[in-house]
Amino acid sequence: MAFWETVLGKYIMTMAIAAVPVVELRGAIPAGIAAGLDPWLACGAAIFGNLLPVPFIILLVRQVFDRLRKHAFFAPKIDALERRAHLKGRLVRKYRLLGLMLFVAIPLPGTGAWTGALIAAFLNIRLRHALPAITLGLLIAGSLVTLMTLGIIHLLLSLIHIS
């Protein structure tokens, strides 16, 4: 049996997928469920995996961006990322931690822990304040994605039985 076929391997796979930007828990939860994990345990693994990069992003992204900006190749890309984070940060600027939690809680592309952490870093929200807000947002988003995934599975199964 290959490692990725074991229960531990499936949990690690779910956490690893959730740690990837853009995919995050929106892709990790359906992947974990498809791999045979209990839906709510897949949700928990995805939330944990999605949280892993958050402290590093909040604490280090500005220093990394400042160093990369010194290279002509990276400067325009860094500027574009910062502009995007500031544009998406309007809700967070207005409502601070509640806005950050709500921003992360919406399971749509362009929202989530990675963008929420970038926004927190650029708005100088301290890690000790941002991490609980992002965690609550991920709990909400994870629950929504899990329920939507289960609903889609149920719908597909009912369509198969109708045919």
Task: Map each language-model feature to its residues.
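Histidine-/acidic- and/or cysteine-rich, low-complexity loops and terminal segments associated
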Residues: M1-V7
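Conserved small/polar residues in nucleotide/adenosyl-binding loops
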Residues: I160-S163
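Helix-adjacent hinge/juxtasegments
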Residues: L52-V92
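Membrane-water interface at transmembrane helix exits
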Residues: I33, V61-F65, R69, A120, ...
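Hydrophobic transmembrane alpha-helix bundles
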Residues: R67, D79-H86, W114, H129-A141, ...
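Hydrophobic alpha-helical membrane segments of integral membrane proteins
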Residues: V7-L51, L59-L60, R90-T146
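Generic alpha-helical propensity signal that fires on short helical segments
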Residues: L41-C43, P55, A72, E82, ...
